Amino acid sequence: MAEIKNYTLNFGPQHPAAHGVLRLVLELDGEVIQRADPHIGLLHRATEKLAENKTFIQSVPYMDRLDYVSMMVNEHGYVLAIERLLGIDVPERAQYIRVLFDEITRVLNHLMWIGAHALDVGAMAVFLYAFREREDLMDVYEAVSGARMHAAYYRPGGVYRDLPDAMPQYKASKIRNEKALAKMNEARSGSVLDFIDDFFTRFPKCVDEYETLLTDNRIWKQRLVGIGVVSPERALQMGLTGPMLRGSGIAWDLRKKQPYEVYDRMDFDVPVGVNGDCYDRYLVRVEEMRQSIRIAKQCIEWLRKNPGPVMTDNHKVAPPSRVGMKTNMEDLIHHFKLFTEGFHVPEGEAYAAVEHPKGEFGIYLVSDGANKPYRLKIRAPGFAHLASLDEMARGHMIADAVTIIGTQDIVFGEIDR
């Protein structure tokens, strides 16, 4: 009798459903996956090593480029670690702004995820809808930092600047007449806070639209229910965090269990799954978007009533004001020294973790008292999730591997670092 050999298939790295540069070596029995071996490192940029040669402030933009879909939350983990080593307090207003932008970033991430995941499985319309909403949030990023993606908005001691009084307006062009322009700029006549408020007032209807398209859709359920099941015990053993862990029924959320900034004042719920399959993880993330709306609304309400500083008054860390810098020589020298030489951080080590849209994003920082980190270790949530791919995909079809990669919400910037 002829012996049966398993078939080896290379999936990626140039594959539309591989979310970047994933190379999977699949061992197949017919169309059933026996083993999935992810090959990583194709997007390795030595971020941890680069940070050792840059001052503490100069490494903030590197954080944006880790998970390049959830930019500001990466920065948050990094600046929290520095603040713990420095022992400085962040002004209350800056903390609220950070929490607001963490939730904006969570929505940005989940919109990208729901669009890409649905597109991989074969539902194209959701992708277009999700990007329509992402555009508005990208504009908010641009309004506060000048960049649509890599913002570098969070700084040790606070944020780069307070929320501006005006939103960028759409300009007239060949494809937009005056009437269309007026409609597009309708929500942009007020401050950035007004625009964010308007967005989160409209957004629940948008989430309802995605749910109408997907939640009870027969094909969507056939593709997701019972696929990539992870038991609560295995989820903990494999180091899964975030929606991957909560989808298996464990209500672990750093915003509730180990609150940072002002999350302990926020009123929100932690959604958990029941079966630990792809469908449950989908439901958890959709509900997370709804909870982000609640948190953002609470932040907006507080920020409207409480003006104040957004940067610490410790001048060894905080740069002088732009106005002072242009009129006062001492301020100019101070600014120059701060951005060339940087500030010295006391000897010691600190670990700061934030509830990233993908899971627990941790920064372990070791300082030897210099103006640069001695060692920076990045704990990326996607790394543990990708490691669980083999176990989640065994016994499933090739098409289900695409679903499982989608449900893990993988971005290679943070995995390869």
Swiss-Prot record:
It comes from the Bacteria. Its EC number is 7.1.1.-. Keywords: Cell inner membrane, Cell membrane, Membrane, NAD, Quinone, Translocase, Transport, Ubiquinone. One of its GO terms (cellular component) is plasma membrane. SUPFAM superfamilies: HydB/Nqo4-like (SSF56762). The keyword Methyltransferase does not apply. Pfam families: Complex1_49kDa (PF00346). It is found in: Cell inner membrane. One of its GO terms (molecular function) is quinone binding. It catalyses: a quinone + NADH + 5 H(+)(in) = a quinol + NAD(+) + 4 H(+)(out). Its main location: membrane. It is a peripheral membrane protein. NDH-1 is composed of 14 different subunits. Subunits NuoB, C, D, E, F, and G constitute the peripheral sector of the complex. HAMAP family: NDH1_NuoD. Belongs to the complex I 49 kDa subunit family. NDH-1 shuttles electrons from NADH, via FMN and iron-sulfur (Fe-S) centers, to quinones in the respiratory chain. The immediate electron acceptor for the enzyme in this species is believed to be ubiquinone. Couples the redox reaction to proton translocation (for every two electrons transferred, four hydrogen ions are translocated across the cytoplasmic membrane), and thus conserves the redox energy in a proton gradient. This is NADH-quinone oxidoreductase subunit D. The gene is nuoD.
